[in-house]
């Protein structure tokens, strides 16, 4: 570096990210990469926020804060907050972060992100994807949860007539039909 007239960089050791108490995360063992997490329906901001907090803790007034914008992470990051002990990757915690980010999105942004997943199950173009997205925003933890939540829009499931019978209320299929009308 000195030969080129460059400043000597400061090297920092970051502890490994572990899959459990005894094993490092590794693609060889099927642990997810960033692309895998994106394909599983996680938002980039949620992944960044979670990974940033794996081996680092903010100091000061934001020491208790979990959800950060990218600009807040950049502003608050300090090498002194890096942990010396390994961090354990918890997919449930990442899912919590992702659900928080999904719910915080503007309705239009959520509708745009959700539309491809809605269209996987709802093939009818007459169905308004943004109206469906408005119903889903508070109910999804990952974008990939959406297709299974909306698959009934195109084809209603077949219900057994016994479903409408209740002995306590003394209803049968005929009475139930009248009540529904």
Ranges and model annotations:
Residues 107-181:
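Small-residue-rich helix-loop
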């Amino acid at each position: 570096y000195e030969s080129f007239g460059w400043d000597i960089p400061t090297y920092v050791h970051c502890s490994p990210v572990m899959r459990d108490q005894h094993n490092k995360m590794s693609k060889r063992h099927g642990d997810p990469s960033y692309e895998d997490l994106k394909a599983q329906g996680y938002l980039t901001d949620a992944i960044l926020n979670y990974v940033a907090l794996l081996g680092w803790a903010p100091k000061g007034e934001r020491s208790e804060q979990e959800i950060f914008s990218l600009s807040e992470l950049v502003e608050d990051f300090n090498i002194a907050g890096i942990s010396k002990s390994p961090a354990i990757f918890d997919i449930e915690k990442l899912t919590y972060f992702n659900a928080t980010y999904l719910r915080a999105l503007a309705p239009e942004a959520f509708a745009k992100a959700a539309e491809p997943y809605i269209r996987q199950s709802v093939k009818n173009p007459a169905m308004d994807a943004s109206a469906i997205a408005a119903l889903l925003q508070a109910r999804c933890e990952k974008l990939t949860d959406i297709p299974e939540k909306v698959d009934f829009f195109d084809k209603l499931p077949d219900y057994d007539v016994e479903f409408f019978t209740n002995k306590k209320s003394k209803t049968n299929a005929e009475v139930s039909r009248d009540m529904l009308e």
